[in-house]
Amino acid sequence: MRNPILRRAAARTAFLLLFAAGVGGLGAQPVLDIEEELDFDHPEAWAMKFFTSASLLTSLGPVERREAGAVDLGLELITIPHLDREQRTVGFGGFKEEELNRLPVWARLRVAFGLPRGFTAVVGWVPPAELDGVKANLFSAAIEKAILQGDRWGLGVRLYAQVGDAEADFTCAAGEERSPPGSPENPFGCEAPSDDEVTLEYVGLEWTGSYRFRRPRAPVLHLGVAVNHLDMEFQVNARTFGFLDRTRLLADGETVSATAGATWSLGQKTKAGFEVFYSPLSVERPGAESSDNDPLLHLRALLRYRLR
């Protein structure tokens, strides 16, 4: 049975029959604990791809040769596009609208370290501060090297990865439990705000080219292309219709992405960069005969300060 909705319904029915027959003897709450390997274009997989792609540790500027021991501190801002109702309807195979529009902007701390032989290590961190019911703890890192750096043209290569997760009441948003289970306002029987966890992990390889104008105060332009492997998991933790839903959804696959932007020097030690990010993301929604492209297109910014 490939349909996740039918599988969960069958599992709930089995639990009900066992519970009614007295297997739930001590009155413990039945637990729905199944694991679903999703196709990469499944609606729920698309939602995970969307937010994982938003967290990719892109160059956000040209790949530069730093002296060994140099340290740059940075603050990155990542805009998150607003999702319409169709895009938010990803739960239960694309039939349940989820509360995905939480934060319009993410912030990430970045530190770049100059290493011997022209390498640079970049570390990024989204600290676990709870904002609008979302608490993310994402650790990312990259190793990069400028393989060509002339007076005007440059080319660099980067290898990056991320581990971490985000927690929020995605499945049962706060307030849904106030309506009777099964009612139009609470059709999926939420009894309390859920405590879901989504794992956003990846590894990627990026090539970044750059161009420097001869004019003073002119920006440095950059263009990047990357291939990414996304490894994602959504752990449901919701009480619905008398059950504790602990369904685990897994998805992994490859994406490509492109970036274009510019970086300005604001002084001897400070730089500001902006970037447009694009990644095509396939999705097959209920009723569709084939996959469509519902891409991620958004803006990023980075303010850097040379500490030493």
Segments from the language model and where they lie:
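Transmembrane beta-barrel domains of Gram-negative outer membranes and organellar outer membranes
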Residues: 29-150
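Outer-membrane beta-barrel transmembrane domain signature
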Residues: 29-50, 79-84, 88-90, 172-271, ...
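Outer-membrane beta-barrel "beta-signal"
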Residues: 294-308
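Transmembrane beta-strand segments that form the barrel wall of outer-membrane beta-barrel proteins
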Residues: 119-131, 139-143, 155-159, 270-286
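Transmembrane beta-barrel strands of outer-membrane/channel proteins
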Residues: 73-79, 121-127, 157-165, 221-229, ...
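Hydrophobic, lipid-facing positions within transmembrane beta-strands of outer-membrane proteins
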Residues: 69-71, 105-109, 137-143, 201-207, ...
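Outer-envelope beta-barrel architecture signal
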Residues: 30, 67-73, 117-119, 151-157, ...
